[in-house]
């Protein structure tokens, strides 16, 4: 009887939580094998930014939601591997029609997943989308994220000024950290533009996501509380549940960087996939094929 009561209670709780998330209208291109791919998208929608939005840009300068951070996780053979996908990567969103992943979201989630499939052969079994406000809430709810900097990093536009070394960032600082595009590092006593460019932004986003995944609570009560706070700022594809998301928390297979051609600075803002791009995605199990 106790087991039955617990089962009913958990089912009811799951149903209640699911109702707090928006459902995405999108036809996913799922895996052709027994593996699963989860794609997490952090969208830059200034209308849904946290309080004090001037820290992250003027609302009047931005229209519509863009894919700002993109993380792909692959679960297969008892391992979970992940890769941070460059937002400036050019993909085919429709036959002979191209767009950057970031701005493809302006067309809707269908164009985004079609682009991943057509250009990268990346299936998507689960899609989770979170806005800026939700990102800040999530980071604060898990007690911040731990990052390590080789050099001090500052970016006036992202409102960050961080020392070298290992440190814990709160939600607002973590958001500035992953969104920094005009950062400077202190090396040899001189502040110089961050030599990593867009690749550094990709790496920082991956570092923060890894820290978040490691810190997701295992206790069901704590997990429920976290989900209750963040799901209103989240959109999920049909058939994607909280348990599906939690199932990807352990990156036992490691994290893969995704090299691209171009897209490394403000003057060169379009990145192209090349053989190294496809090899990295294949290594992570993320290019297993799909059908549009």
Residue ranges: model-predicted function:
Residues 1-292:
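Non-catalytic, solvent-exposed segments at the cell envelope interface
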């Amino acid at each position: 009887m106790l087991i039955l009561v617990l089962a009913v209670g958990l089912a009811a709780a799951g149903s209640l939580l699911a109702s707090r998330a928006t459902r995405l209208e999108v036809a996913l291109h799922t895996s052709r094998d027994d593996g699963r791919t989860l794609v997490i998208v952090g969208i830059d929608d200034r209308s849904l930014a946290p309080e004090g939005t001037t820290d992250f840009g003027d609302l009047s300068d931005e229209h519509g939601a863009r894919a700002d951070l993109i993380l792909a996780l692959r679960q297969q053979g008892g391992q979970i591997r992940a890769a941070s996908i460059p937002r400036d990567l050019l993909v085919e969103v429709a036959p002979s029609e191209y767009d950057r992943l970031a701005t493809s979201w302006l067309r809707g989630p269908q164009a985004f997943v079609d682009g991943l499939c057509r250009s990268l052969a990346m299936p998507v079994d689960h899609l989770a989308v979170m806005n800026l406000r939700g990102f800040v809430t999530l980071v604060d709810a898990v007690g911040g994220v731990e990052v390590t900097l080789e050099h001090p990093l500052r970016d006036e536009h992202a409102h960050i000024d961080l020392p070298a070394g290992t440190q814990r960032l709160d939600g607002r600082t973590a958001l500035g950290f992953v969104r920094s595009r005009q950062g400077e590092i202190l090396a040899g006593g001189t502040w110089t533009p961050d030599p990593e460019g867009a690749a550094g932004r990709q790496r920082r986003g991956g570092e923060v996501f890894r820290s978040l995944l490691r810190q997701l609570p295992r206790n069901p009560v704590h997990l429920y509380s976290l989900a209750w706070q963040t799901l209103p700022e989240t959109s999920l594809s049909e058939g994607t549940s909280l348990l599906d998301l939690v199932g990807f928390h352990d990156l036992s297979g490691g994290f893969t960087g995704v090299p691209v051609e171009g897209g490394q600075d403000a003057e060169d803002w379009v990145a192209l996939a090349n053989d190294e791009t496809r090899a990295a995605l294949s290594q992570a199990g993320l290019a297993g094929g799909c059908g549009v």
